[in-house]
Every structure is written in structure tokens, then in C-alpha cells.
């Protein structure tokens, strides 16, 4: 499983499992099998 912090949304085929915070910006934690 590979996970990335992305914004504004996850790519198709990815599942959001949480959030990342980098500085004052929130990202979606997106994982793909």
C-alpha cells in the first residue's frame, strides 16, 4: 500500500484514510493498493 498527502482531492482509485497537516495546510491522506 502506498500513501500520499494530496490536495484538493484524492485521485481515482485511491482511498482517503485520514488527513495530513503540513504547516497550516491540511491535505488528504490518500492510499492505493
Swiss-Prot record:
Keyword Disulfide bond: yes
GO biological process: defense response to bacterium; defense response to fungus; killing of cells of another organism
GO cellular component term, pick one: extracellular region
Positions of disulphide bridges: 3-31, 5-20, 10-30
Family matches, as SUPFAM superfamilies: Defensin-like (SSF57392)
Keyword annotations of the record: Antibiotic, Antimicrobial, Defensin, Disulfide bond, Fungicide, Secreted
Source taxon at top rank: Eukaryota
UniProt keyword Disulfide bond present: yes
Post-translational modification remark: HANP-2 could be a product of proteolytic N-terminal amino acid removal from HANP-4.
InterPro entries assigned to the protein according to its UniProt record, in alphabetical order: Alpha-defensin_C
Pfam families associated with the record: Defensin_1
Cell compartments where the protein resides: Secreted
Task of the protein: Bactericidal activity, greater against Gram-positive bacteria. Low anti-fungi activity.
Family: Belongs to the alpha-defensin family.
UniProt-recorded name of the protein: Neutrophil defensin 4
Lineage: Eukaryota, Metazoa, Chordata, Craniata, Vertebrata
